[in-house]
């Protein structure tokens, strides 16, 4: 499960930003294995096991790529336990999934997203499945940001209780 502001399926040749953080899902499902996976001995994850949640800042090539895959997509507020892939889950939360008005100071803001409370509720639902093996949180803030004071309580409360 990945909760990003962007789809994270860009390619170095087609991404508008050129930012490597916008490419991990595509690499995860087997694109360009020599770049990272082969050297580390990693195998691709099956497309049907990958689900970006809330990704909305997509380049046209990303839209076209996703249309031709088995990668599932949903919105944060539309996420339900029945749609979650079976088996153990790695949940990656990129704070740019949260509306940029709620998380000022992001280097790669994605306006129009869900609020902190909606994202915290989605995390609680995922944790309640009992199948979350690990959670990663990523955020690229400009120095001197003030968003931690807003988002911190939602994340701390959600992750501390595990539900």
Q: What are the roles of these predicted feature ranges?
A:
Residues 1-36, 129-130:
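Active-site histidine-anchored catalytic micro-motif
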Residues 1-4, 53, 91-95:
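Active-site flanking residues adjacent to catalytic metal/cofactor-binding acidic residues
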Residues 5-7, 57, 95-99:
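Short, glycine/acidic-enriched loop or turn micro-motifs at the edges of active sites
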Residues 11-15, 36-40, 60-67, 102-103:
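A short secondary-structure junction signal
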Residues 17-18, 41-45, 83:
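Solvent-exposed alpha-helices and their adjacent loops that cap or buttress functional pockets
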Residues 21-24, 46, 62:
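Internal, well-ordered alpha-helical segments in soluble enzyme and binding-protein domains
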Residues 31, 37-50, 55-60:
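Phosphate/diphosphate-binding glycine-rich loops and adjacent basic-rich segments that engage nucleotide
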Residues 63-163:
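Catalytic cores of soluble, metal-dependent hydrolases
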């Amino acid at each position: 499960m990945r909760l990003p502001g962007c789809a994270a399926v860009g390619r170095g040749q087609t991404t508008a930003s050129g930012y490597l953080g916008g490419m991990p899902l595509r690499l995860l499902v087997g694109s360009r294995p020599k770049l990272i996976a082969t050297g580390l001995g990693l195998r691709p994850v099956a497309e049907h096991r990958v689900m970006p949640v809330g990704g909305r800042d997509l380049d046209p090539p990303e839209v076209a790529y996703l249309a031709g895959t088995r990668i599932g997509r949903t919105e944060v507020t539309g996420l339900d336990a029945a749609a979650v892939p079976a088996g153990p889950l790695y949940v990656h939360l990129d704070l740019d999934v949260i509306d940029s008005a709620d998380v000022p100071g992001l280097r790669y803001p994605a306006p129009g997203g869900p609020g902190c409370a909606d994202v915290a509720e989605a995390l609680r639902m995922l944790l309640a499945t009992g199948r979350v093996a690990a959670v990663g949180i990523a955020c690229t803030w400009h120095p001197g940001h003030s968003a931690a004071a807003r988002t911190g309580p939602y994340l701390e409360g959600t992750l501390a209780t595990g539900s």
